Amino acid sequence: MSNNILLIDYETLGQSPDTVILSLGAIVFDMDDPPSYQEVLDQGFYETFSVDEQVKDGRVIDKSTVDWWGQQGKEAAHVLKPSDDDISYKEMIPRLKEYIGDVRGVKTFARSASFDFSITNDIVRRLGQQLPWQWWNERDTRTLIECYLELLEINKKNNFDVPDQGVEVVAHHALHDVAMDVIRIS
């Protein structure tokens, strides 16, 4: 068995490629032996980032997104509060590369590809870094889920229900969102 899937998810303060990122969740795993929800939480990559540093570096905040965050539950809003655990966004790519390991043949999925990948591309371009995965292996989680639903003739929205995971699911938490997508695609 080898790790052949990487799922990523950002939580942000906007929708543009140069938006401030609040957190990044990721999991690398073998599709033939996918992790449980709890295993994603235990083994996944999760970092929160300093907002002030990003604003000083010219990353942007969208007021409508900030307003949207204000309407989310307090579990989700935890990411808005500065924490001693916040790291520099400049450390994100090296840490993610270390977590991922060998990326040859790894398919990298995001929900949606035009959002998460554009943010990563903006960061690596600005910082003169390299993508932590092979760009030609980028995939869209929504498309995969949609095809799966159509194949099984399930008439549900793209965010279809998943069985009880035995842990509290936190919406709009990057690592929990990744865990939900692991369950959906496996």
Give names to the regions the model predicted.
Residues I61-T65, C147-N158:
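Short, surface-exposed amphipathic charged segments that create phosphate/polyanion-binding patches used
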Residues S2-L6, E11-A110:
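Conserved non-catalytic scaffold segment of RNase H-like nuclease domains
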Residues D122-L127, C147-L151, R184:
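Active-site catalytic microenvironments for nucleophilic, acid-base chemistry
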Residues P132-I154:
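Short, flexible loop segments at boundaries between secondary-structure elements
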Residues K107-S114, S118-I119, K157-S186:
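Acidic, Mg2+-coordinating catalytic module of metal-dependent nucleases/exonucleases
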Residues K97-I100, S114-W136:
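Substrate-recognition/cap helix-loop segment adjacent to the acidic, metal-dependent catalytic center
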Residues D9-E11, D116, D140, D177:
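Acidic active-site catalytic centers that drive phospho-/nucleotidyl reactions
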